[in-house]
Amino acid sequence: SSRFMKTMTEGPNPAPLFPKLTPRDVHKMAVGQVGYTGWCDEDGKMLDDGTVSRLGENLFRLTSAEPSLRWLSMNAVGMDVTITEVTEQVAALSLQGPKSRTVLNRVCAKSLDKLKYFRVMPNTLAGKPVTISRTGYTGDLGYEIWIDVADALHVWDALMAAGNDYGIVPCGILAMDMARVEAGLFMIDVDYTAANHAWIEGQKSTPLEMGLDWAVQLDKPGYFVGRRALEREKSEGSAWKLMGFEVDWESMERLFAASGLPPQIPGMAVRGSLPLLLGGNQVGYASTSTWSPVLKKYIALVHLQRPYYEPGTQLQMEITVEHKRLHANGKVVKLPFYEPEWKKK
């Protein structure tokens, strides 16, 4: 099943709710379209992020990491909408990878060949009614299958059987961690702290700081929560930015060789703060770092203060060698680190 919360909103006119809550222009979304978005408090600080799917003219589904029922209900006062928490009723299975479409076409009544990136369609999978969205958390070609909880195991078994010829394997969040970092995708509670959970202002982030400029549509009409703060940040520039960081491999080799060791690479992504320095002064930190099996590089999602977030900036990242804290050279890069050509085809 999925680790995220799911909420349905419907009614004679539920469309105004999401344009009020999110910086995305949800009014423009067609039926069958999915939009990724963050949402903010009044100060433009992120509370959560997820997707809005327009399943019908007046039917929307929101996914989020945190329970959102109360937040939606508070903002829907006076609107003619019904908001329902469906996390326990709807299961979501994520099928990701270059062969995901081929596998789905084996077990679905309707072909997935025409389903575009970030679109959603009703289908039948192994005899069970499902909704399939071309979305995911890996940065690869992939789909998420939305099903009644009672049918989830049947659908899982059908997918495992259909994918057997292609070496399909179950995958947990720690494996997905490596893929999501390669794809430049951040995670709540790891790469940013929800504004309503932060102890101090410095722990909060804005969608512009998190690189979601493309999802903050300030040209859309009307008010949305956090709009004024985000307009101010857009004109003044962001104090911090989420960027990529590539560690120089030879620099790491030298640091480990000084202790008579080959470079020690963690077998999974490291969720933890690692300082980034310039000339001995800390200018930011890594929030998730990992060895990239695809790129054969040690990479990290990093938060950097202005002006150090410009691509190409040479910095040092803290690494530990034999219980000693040392600093490996590296450079700031744009995200994503990797995007396969077939992802959006």
What are these regions (language model features)?
Residues 40-51, 223:
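Cytochrome P450
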Residues 53-345:
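Conserved, structured C-terminal
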